[in-house]
Each structure stands twice: as C-alpha cells, then as structure tokens.
Design a protein with these regions (language model features):
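Short, structured "edge-of-domain" segments at secondary-structure transitions
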Residues: 1-189
Length: 189
C-alpha cells in the first residue's frame, strides 16, 4: 500500500499500518515530483506523488496506480529528481548508472528497462547525487562467495536507455552478486 505524508524527516516508527503490513521504503521528495520503481523483472513504473493518498489512512494498493504482472514485486524505488542518479545492479554482476529522471514512463504497464539473464534478479537500487556518480565516489560489490571488489563509480557510464549494463564484477559459476554499497568519506561501507 502507498501513501504520502507532507513534510520531511518523519519518524517512521510512529506510523501505523494494517495488520500484516509494514514499512518497505520511504522516499523524501516534493509533492509535485514523480517517483519510479523497478520490479524484479526489470520493468520500470512511474507514479505522480500528488496522486498518492494522504498519510493518515491506510493508503491505496500499488495495483491501483500501475499494472504489475502477476506475482511481480518492487525491487526498489527512485525519486525522479533531475539532480539524482541511481546505481542499478543485477545478481549476475552487471549494472549501470542512470539519471533518475531518465527512467520515467507514462505507461501504466511500465516499460522494460533492465535486461536480466536467466535466474537473475535486481538488487535494490542506490540513489545518490548525480555529481557524486561522476566524481570520486567508490562503490563496493560483495559476491556470494565473500569476494569484495571496490572501484570508482565514475568508471561506469551513465546510461539513459537501460539494457544489460556493464560488468561490475566477474563471477564464477554458481556465484552471484549479493550486495552493492557506496563507500563513505571515511572508507566505511
């Protein structure tokens, strides 16, 4: 279920939910903005924040806004801020950097954006300022066999069209990428 609250800096632990529901994600953005999300099949969908129900009720189901294929689940959310970028990575070790504003679509059924290989899934996207994606920002990739690779994010080209992306980490047979994180100024992941 989706809902919008006015203002920033809300304490999410104080929000109430229906029995069996809980908080999945929060995005701070303007009420005039759009937000996008990717599903596990690599399709992207866009919602107008102004169309979301207010934060006092239980919200509305995601299916009221978009036509998700049966069984599809959101893999992650991105605000459509023109000054934001997002890192999109698959469990197969491929990924891309994109401008958050480039993933928007008007189609209620969404559009294909990320091409996934057999048995691959999307890792949650990482949103960051566009300047950081083109600067000295480091990114760390962790594989299922506990191999860690850290490299400058500026080595990854910014794309607007999606697709497979480039190789973030070469994986052995049966190995998958399990986590991707930005390295902060202190070198912590």
């Amino acid at each position: 279920f989706l809902r919008a609250r006015t203002g920033h800096g809300h304490d999410c632990s104080l929000m109430s939910f229906k029995t069996g529901d809980g908080l999945e994600a929060t995005i701070e953005c303007r009420s005039s903005s759009q937000i996008s999300f990717l599903d596990q099949a690599g399709r992207v969908y866009t919602l107008a924040v102004s169309a979301l129900p207010g934060g006092r009720g239980d919200g509305s189901p995601l299916s009221a806004f978009v036509d998700l294929p049966k069984g599809a689940q959101p893999a992650g959310w991105i605000s459509a801020d023109p000054n934001a970028a997002a890192v999109i990575v698959t469990s197969g070790g491929k990924g891309m950097v994109l401008k958050a504003s480039d993933v928007s679509t008007r189609l209620k059924a969404g559009r294909d954006f990320v091409t996934l290989g057999e048995g691959e899934s999307l890792l949650p996207p990482i949103e960051l300022p566009l300047k950081a994606a083109q600067g000295e920002q480091l990114i760390a990739c962790l594989s299922s066999s506990n191999r860690l690779l850290v490299f400058p994010l500026k080595e990854v080209r910014v794309t607007a069209s999606g697709g497979k992306g480039m190789s973030f980490m070469t994986l052995e047979t049966g190995e998958s990428l399990v986590s991707v994180a930005l390295v902060d100024d202190r070198g912590a992941i």
